[in-house]
Amino acid sequence: MNAQGIDLGEGTAGFVLGDGPVGILLIHGLTGTPTELRQVAKGLAKAGNCTVYVPTLAGHCGDNSDLQATGWQDWYEGVRKTFVQVKQRHAQVFVGGLSMGAVMSMYVASEHPGQVAGLLMYSTTLKYDGWSINKLAFLTPLLMKIPFGVHICSFEEKPPYGIKNERLRAIVERQMKEGESSEAGLLTMEGITVRELHRMNAVVKKRMPQIKVPALVLHSIEDDITSRWNADYVERHLGGPVTKILLDNCYHMITVDLQYRRVIELSARFVEQHTVFKSTRINVGAGSPAMASLRSA
């Protein structure tokens, strides 16, 4: 719980920014941390009409044993609790996320029909098919079905770690290798965790046509983890109106990479277009310079 009585998950990594009437719930990625959404949360809060909530998913910001002890329904249950509390405080609530968090935002909308004002989907991850992914990765779903298959699979984060900004990439690499999981996330991901992602994605894909809320889908054409196929799939199958925008000069982690200001600008505009509350346009050129460290407050 934070000072506002909102459940932000385990530990102290989750945060709330802003004090506006529109609520925005952002969900971090698999093996990730709330920190990867801090820059976007700060930018949206500066718009003046938003309060942004970023919880920690169950099993995250610890070690792999913590993560393996949880499944996708545990991750969702924490998000559900936060969403219910945020909805009690705000007439309009937008939900979004990065990577797996974008997929989970769709699940939230499907579980709470008529209660989500819109979706903010960053680098949606329905399958790992980016240019840095091993070409045999397509076999992973098959291995997940073989007895003990999940126990022989292990995936390690490798350069460029979803980040084109070389300075930031070096900082993230150091933090991951030094075990600073609450800042940069985990360096490895076990097969059990990957299986949970596949299970959640299968459920969400079936529900997508029934999700009628408007969605902003942002994806990099240079994404090293998940190709634009993922954004195209959302555009084709989501039941509501989709605004898909492809970014250049960044990799998978678009919320912290070289185009994060563009992500803020597009997100703020989308929220303003789909809310009953209006505010002055956010000045994304003001404030902090390009993110120098994932510890940026």
Question: PLM features: residue spans?
Answer:
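Conserved alpha/beta-hydrolase "acid-adjacent" motif
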Residues: 224-230
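Short beta-strand/loop motif that positions the catalytic acidic residue
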Residues: 211, 217-219, 223
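Catalytic nucleophile-loop/oxyanion-hole region of alpha/beta-hydrolase
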Residues: 63-94
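Alpha/beta-hydrolase-fold enzymes
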Residues: 100, 111-187
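Catalytic active-site module of serine/aspartate enzymes centered on a nucleophile-bearing elbow/loop
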Residues: 241-281
